[in-house]
């Protein structure tokens, strides 16, 4: 088979199963409204859960820091790219979340890949929730360690997998809030099982940090859990981008030596780090608390209004509210029907989610108003799908 034939066959297979992804060009993609092709839509596809991407205080912090530092970091943090802005943000994050150290990464994908590939060796075992993010599962597959996956949130299955003999070390991998289902992991029980088997725990709290817990400290804090490795990302609740790994002093020193995604990548711009510090200040403030309360009320309003006889609503109380429709083509038709009525939502299909669980992944944000939720419900229940 030629290279071109391989490419063509893969695309043809995606088209045949209604799983071909496409991008949409937007003029504005975060916040209450999405603007595309000159039309304005109520935006139910953004991860900007607290509406902070448009916050004037955070925008101003980025602008002022760009004037001071320039628009790029100029290099890896191991060379010349680790600024006082990066250092300050790491210290603020560590203090806020109660860890000795925090290390910044350019993305959550990079952070997850870096930690797993740096730590895991031959004869080790990774035991990951079956619905873990692609960055976690890909890193596990690429590492020399054995990968075993436990049934989603099934702690008995997790325990059985950890009980089987392992010559090396074991790492349990889970998420705080799951990106496609919107539900939460039983973190306290998972941590208890991991410790019983002398395994370390890695929690990716991309969708919980900033949004849940006291001062927005996330799902782990809310559940009284402190994993050995906590990954937080900044493209959701923080409204910016990037990520950090919270860990012990020695693990941080180890990652600085062996995490190739950290060593060989240009650091995030110092202006971005400054904006993240400003975002953290808002998250921890009374205003941040008010934003979280408003978001929680909007989620409750939506869940109370969904017609359960037409849509399968998962046990999700986060900003992520998936409506399971099953069939790929139906999910695409439903998303298009919503767009025709001025509501922007995306159809999520395999391989992102399991076969037969195609869905509308609706995300609610603090930027929405109650009338926006009512309009979404009206459109959903008025469609023929």
From Swiss-Prot:
SUPFAM superfamilies: PLP-dependent transferases. The modification N6-(pyridoxal phosphate)lysine is found at residue 236. Keywords: Biotin biosynthesis, Pyridoxal phosphate, Transferase. Substrate binds at residues 21, 133, 352. Its cofactor is pyridoxal 5'-phosphate. It catalyses: 6-carboxyhexanoyl-[ACP] + L-alanine + H(+) = (8S)-8-amino-7-oxononanoate + holo-[ACP] + CO2. Its EC number is 2.3.1.47. One of its GO terms (molecular function) is 8-amino-7-oxononanoate synthase activity. Pathway: Cofactor biosynthesis; biotin biosynthesis. It comes from the Bacteria. Belongs to the class-II pyridoxal-phosphate-dependent aminotransferase family. BioF subfamily. Homodimer. NCBIfam families: bioF. Catalyzes the decarboxylative condensation of pimeloyl-[acyl-carrier protein] and L-alanine to produce 8-amino-7-oxononanoate (AON), [acyl-carrier protein], and carbon dioxide. This is 8-amino-7-oxononanoate synthase. It comes from Salmonella agona (strain SL483).
């Amino acid at each position: 088979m030629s290279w071109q034939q391989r490419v063509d066959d893969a695309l043809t297979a995606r088209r045949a199963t209604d799983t071909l992804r496409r991008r949409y060009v937007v003029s504005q993609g975060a916040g209450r409204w999405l603007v595309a092709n000159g039309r304005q839509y109520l935006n139910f596809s953004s991860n900007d859960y607290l509406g902070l991407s448009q916050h004037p205080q955070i925008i101003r912090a980025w602008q002022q820091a760009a004037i001071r530092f320039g628009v790029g970091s100029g290099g890896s943090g191991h060379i010349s790219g680790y600024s006082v802005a990066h250092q300050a943000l790491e210290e603020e994050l560590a203090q806020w979340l109660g860890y000795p150290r925090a290390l910044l990464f350019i993305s959550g994908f990079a952070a997850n890949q870096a930690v797993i590939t740096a730590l895991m060796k031959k004869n080790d075992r990774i035991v990951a929730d079956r619905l873990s993010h692609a960055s976690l599962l890909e890193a596990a597959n690429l590492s020399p360690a054995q990968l075993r996956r436990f049934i989603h949130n099934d702690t008995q299955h997790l325990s059985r997998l950890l009980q089987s003999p392992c010559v090396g070390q074991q790492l349990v991998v889970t998420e705080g809030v799951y990106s496609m289902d919107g539900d939460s992991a039983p973190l306290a029980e998972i941590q208890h099982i991991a410790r019983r088997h002398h395994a370390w725990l890695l929690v990716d709290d991309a969708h919980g940090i900033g949004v849940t817990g006291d001062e927005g400290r996330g799902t782990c804090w809310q559940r009284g859990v402190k994993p050995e490795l906590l990954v937080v990302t900044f493209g959701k609740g923080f409204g910016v981008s990037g990520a950090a790994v919270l860990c012990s002093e020695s693990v941080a020193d180890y990652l600085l030596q062996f995490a190739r995604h950290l060593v060989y990548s240009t650091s995030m711009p110092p202006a971005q780090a400054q904006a993240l510090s400003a975002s953290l200040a808002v998250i921890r403030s009374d205003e941040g608390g008010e934003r979280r309360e408003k978001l929680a009320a909007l989620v409750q309003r939506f869940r109370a209004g969904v017609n359960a006889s037409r849509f399968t609503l998962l046990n999700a109380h986060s900003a992520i509210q998936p409506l399971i429709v099953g069939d790929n083509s139906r999910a695409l038709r439903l998303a298009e029907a919503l767009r025709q009525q001025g509501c922007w939502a995306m159809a999520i299909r395999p391989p992102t989610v399991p076969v037969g669980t195609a869905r509308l992944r609706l995300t609610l944000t603090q930027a929405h108003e109650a009338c926006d939720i009512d309009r979404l419900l009206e459109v959903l229940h008025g469609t023929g799908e």
